[in-house]
Amino acid sequence: FSELQKHSIPRRSFIASAGCAFLLSSCSSRQGESSKNSVPIDNVRFLRAGFADGFTMPSTLVTGRPQRAPFFLYGADGLPVVNGLPLEISGELILPSGRSEKVLLSQHSEGIPTPYFLLEFEISEENTGICQLQVDSQELTQIVEFRVIAQTETDLIQVGETMRVVDTPTFTNSAGFDPLCTRYEPCSFHNISLRDALSNGRPTILLVSTPGFCQTTVCGPVLELLIELPKDPKWDVIHAEVYTEPKKIAEGTDLQKLISPVIQTYGMNFEPCFIVAGSDNRVEARLDYAF
C-alpha cells in the first residue's frame, strides 16, 4: 500500500482514461448559474451534479425505475461547502415532456465529509431526454440540466434484475488481484466470492469501491460505513475493488486491462456502488456515487 501512496494519481483520472469515470466531482457544462439581487461574488453558491449527467459523460439515470441524483453545493472558490448548509433545497423538476413537478432535495451529511442534497425521482419510460432542475430562492438561483435515458441504453444493473455471476477475489483465492483490498488494513469482506455467494440461497450485499484512492473532498468513507454496521450472519457481504493491480497504473499499463471483472459485468462507469440482493438474487436496492 505504501507503493500505492507513492505513485498514486487521483482515482477519477484512472477510470476516466479507461473510458469510465469517477463521477463525484463532475459538473454539467450546460448548467445555468446566476446570483440574485447582486450577491457578492464571495457569497455565490451553486449546485454541481455528483453523478453522470449525460453531458460530461454518458448518463446512468434511466426511466421507469426509481432514481437518485446527488448534488453538491459549491462556493465561489470552487470548493464544496460543508458548513452552514440548509437542511433542504426546494425546486422544480422539468421533464423532457415539459411537465413539471415540485421537488425537495434533502441534505445528507451523517458519516461523510461533504454533505450532499439528494434528488429522488421516477419518470415514465417515454420521458427520455433532458431534465431541468430549477432552483430559485434568495440564496440560490440556478438551472441544472441532466439526461435521462431508456433502460436499453445502459448495461448498468437495475433494481429488479437478477444479479450477474462474476468472480471476486477472496483471502484464499486472489483471482489475480494485487492487493485484493486497497484499504490500509484489508477489510473482512473477502471471505466468499460473489460467484459462490449467488449460489448459496442467502441474501447478498455487494460494495464496489476503491478505498485506497479516496483522495477528493466529496469522496465518502463508504467502506468504513459498511464496516461499522452491525453484522448479520444471514447475509453475505462482499467488497470488490475497481482495479486488479492498481500498482501498474503508474507504470503506464493499459487501464482497460486493469478494470476488474465486476465493473465490466455490472455495467458501471463509476464508483462507489452499493447493491443489495435478496436470497433469490434479485436486486432490491442500489446506491450510487454518494451515500
Predicted features along the sequence, with ranges:
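Non-globular targeting/processing and membrane-anchoring segments
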Residues: 32-200
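Thioredoxin-like thiol-disulfide oxidoreductase module
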Residues: 244-270
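Short active-site neighborhood of thiol/selenol oxidoreductases, capturing the structured segment around
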Residues: 197-213
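N-terminal secretory signal peptides
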Residues: 1-9, 17-23, 33
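Loop/turn elements at helix/coil->beta-strand transitions in domains of secreted/extracellular proteins
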Residues: 201-205, 233-236, 271
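A short, hydrophobic beta-strand/beta-hairpin element that forms part of a small beta-sheet core
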Residues: 272-286
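Typically the conserved alpha-helix immediately C-terminal to a functionally engaged Cys/Sec
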Residues: 217-231
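Bacterial signal peptide processing site
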Residues: 28-30
